[in-house]
């Protein structure tokens, strides 16, 4: 089901009623506020194959009347809305206009928003990291960060050594970024053992295949060895680059020397 944002049919109507006598009004301004507004909703099922239009009327934040295209007429939600429901249901032109809103309002707006809201796809960025840097065999929290994706329907699963984890999972839920993208954190409580491989798998409409990101549990000594190896490799590249630079510079200097008096 796709749902378009509810749009107020008119600006909220605020009625200010002054009920105090002038002498009291001079002491303080205590005018009561009354809020009356309505909302139009479009509910889509399987694209525009089935569409439901709702027009809901509220008074002081309480719904009192609605029109439902599935019903085809106005229905009172509270006694306050009953007079309006009876009045509008007795006017065929009003009922005809509301029933036609399924096409004139909902399907019409669906075509406008289709490319931006319905078909729009933004692939998520997925990263995995532990919340604590500490030795193995201690309680830790692995975080799968999924960010900057659209639409909001997404599935995130955790695996340990290829087997899905069903317990110890905590999620922040869907968080709006404010730029038409979402983010979420899905965390796995675990006690990592040396050699274990943890995988975060993400499925999203923007992806043809699930995205998987691994985190391998390594002992401190193994991590130090790996860092030493990477550091040695980088240092070797630096020395190699410096040697090549000096060599080619010397070669260029020698080729530029010629005996005086020769024609070239």
From Swiss-Prot:
Residues in the Cytoplasmic compartment per record: 247-264
A Pfam family: MHC_II_beta
CDD domains associated with the record: IgC1_MHC_II_beta_I-E
Assigned protein family: Belongs to the MHC class II family.
Record localization: Membrane
Keywords from the named record: Adaptive immunity, Disulfide bond, Glycoprotein, Immunity, Membrane, MHC II, Signal, Transmembrane, Transmembrane helix
An example Gene Ontology CC term for this record: lysosomal membrane
Protein's name according to its UniProt entry: H-2 class II histocompatibility antigen, E-Q beta chain
Protein's membrane topology: Single-pass type I membrane protein
Lineage: Eukaryota, Metazoa, Chordata, Craniata, Vertebrata
Extracellular compartment segments: 27-225
């Amino acid at each position: 089901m796709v749902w378009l944002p509810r749009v107020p049919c008119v600006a909220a109507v605020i009625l200010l009623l002054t009920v105090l006598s002038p002498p009291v009004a001079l002491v303080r301004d205590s005018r009561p506020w009354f809020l009356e507004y309505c909302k139009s909703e479009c509910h889509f099922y399987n694209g525009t194959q089935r569409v439901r239009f709702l027009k809901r009327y509220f008074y002081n934040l309480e719904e009192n009347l609605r029109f439902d295209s599935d019903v085809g007429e106005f229905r009172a939600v509270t006694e306050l809305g009953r007079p309006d429901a009876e009045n509008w249901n007795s006017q065929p032109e009003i009922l005809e206009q509301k029933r036609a809103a399924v096409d004139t309002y909902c399907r019409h707006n669906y075509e406008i928003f289709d490319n931006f809201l319905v078909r729009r796809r933004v692939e998520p960025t997925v990263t995995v990291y532990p919340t604590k840097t500490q030795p193995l065999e201690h309680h830790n929290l692995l975080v799968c960060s999924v960010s900057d994706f659209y639409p909001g329907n997404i599935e995130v699963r955790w695996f340990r050594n290829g087997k899905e984890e069903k317990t110890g999972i905590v999620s922040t839920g869907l968080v709006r970024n404010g730029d038409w993208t979402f983010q979420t954190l899905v965390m796995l409580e675990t006690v990592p053992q040396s050699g274990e491989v943890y995988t975060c798998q993400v499925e999203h409409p923007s992806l043809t295949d699930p995205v998987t990101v691994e985190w391998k549990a390594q002992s401190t000594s193994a991590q130090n060895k790996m860092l030493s190896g990477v550091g040695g490799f980088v240092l070797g590249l630096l020395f190699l680059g410096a040697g090549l630079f000096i060599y080619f510079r010397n070669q260029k200097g020698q080729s530029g020397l010629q005996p005086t008096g020769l024609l070239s």
